[in-house]
Amino acid sequence: LFDIRNKANEKGCKVVVCHVLRYTPFYSTIKKEIDGGKLGKIMSMQLNEHVWYGHFVNSYVRGKWRSEKECGSGLLLAKCCHDTDLMCWLNNVTTPKKVSSFGSKSLFCEKNAPEGATQYCYQCPHRKDCPFDAYKFELEKDFIPFYTWLGIGKPLDEITREEKIEFLKKDVYGQCVYKTDMDIVDRQCVSVEFANGSIGTLNMIGGASKAGRHIHIVCEFGEIVGYIEDNKYILRVFDKSELCYKDKTIDLN
């Protein structure tokens, strides 16, 4: 980061961190809803990011982002900085006062490896039943090829199947997910208390069956609930005269 800053200063350029989720129809419309004032002030925000197991294993268990030592950032900064930005941006009438966070490596660690599991999948007696077997996961499914095969040093369309098989016998992409040198957490929770008394929580879970970002905002006179993947949310407004609530689906598709 310092190198980038120094080069920008040298060239007279600006370096801007762009948190692009602010500009999606989903979050920008929610922001307008909150700023409109009908729901009153924010009382509580709950944000969840579930990282699909294919993405998580390729990038954060076997991929280069598995190592804070190599990449200079933990999982929260590498994967979830968008969500911490959203929390503060949606509630930008105030500022964070207190922050607490905890997490650990819970799933992808050696204690969870089946008995007799080997360092590399090609030697492992559990290959047939293991959902993370490198040959099924990387070779057959080939979820994110432009990450996996980069170490071979050839254009993707020139790499043969035989070269890929040999590569998996010696590279981290061929290692047991429970035995890599991953040094980051695989799930983390963040709690924030804001200066105006509102609170926010963020849960990031790595290795989920389905990817998704979910948000639930509770305001004085209503709520907003939705998944960005659906590109729609529920606007729940408290009806003061009837002492009940009314739901309206805001579909942005």
Predicted stretch roles:
Residues 8, 38, 58, 92, ...:
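Generic structural signal for beta-strand residues in well-ordered domains
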Residues 1, 27-28, 214:
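Conserved strand-to-helix beginnings and helix N-cap segments that scaffold or border functional pockets
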Residues 103, 109-253:
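NAD(P)-dinucleotide binding in Rossmann-like oxidoreductases
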Residues 5-6, 21, 32, 244, ...:
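Long, low-complexity, intrinsically disordered N-terminal extensions of eukaryotic proteins, enriched
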Residues 3, 82-85, 212:
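Short Gly/charged-rich anion-binding patches and loops
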Residues 1-14:
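Rossmann-fold NAD(P)-binding glycine/threonine-rich loop
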Residues 8, 34, 90, 237-238, ...:
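Extended hydrophobic/Leu-rich segments
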Residues 11-16, 21-175:
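Predominantly a Rossmann-like dinucleotide-binding segment in NAD(P)-dependent oxidoreductases
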